[in-house]
Amino acid sequence: MPDPLSPAQRHTCMSHIRSTGTKPEMQLRKELFRLGYRYRINKKRLPGSPDIVLAKYSTCIFVNGCFWHGHMDCRYATRPKTNAQFWRTKIENNRERDLKDYTFLESLGWRVIVVWECELKKDRIDATIASVRKQLDANRESCLAELADRRKRREEWQAEIRRRKERSEEIQVNVKIH
């Protein structure tokens, strides 16, 4: 079925679709801020430019639109009947790109939380916020444990360097005596 809009009309329609500052994203950001979480938004230096970045928790949050990111079995993710092949390819490419970005972020040590647009509807938002909060708190505990482990390894490494330095000085003293 051909597109009922002219290319100029379609361009105008598509240019009004926002990629940042969407209503679902703003809802989640507002709730996180209210709960005391502080974050950065749309961090361009990270793969996929996450919508919300909580560095303290080593966590990136993506707020995905059900349609654009192909949320499976979601009533908001129905594909248009016109230009069906284009939309199938577009959404599949989006899903593949998202998976690649999430995997890369995780390989860099980030934890990834994906929140779907439908999870931020009135009847589900409280449960979604509670779930995100639970994940963030778990991530914080994990981050604190990692920091403690790093601190311990750094102290052990510094102690080893001190021992080597002392041995080196002892050897130099012994060489001077003989």
Model-derived features: positions:
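Nucleic-acid endo/exonuclease domains
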Residues: 1-114, 118-178
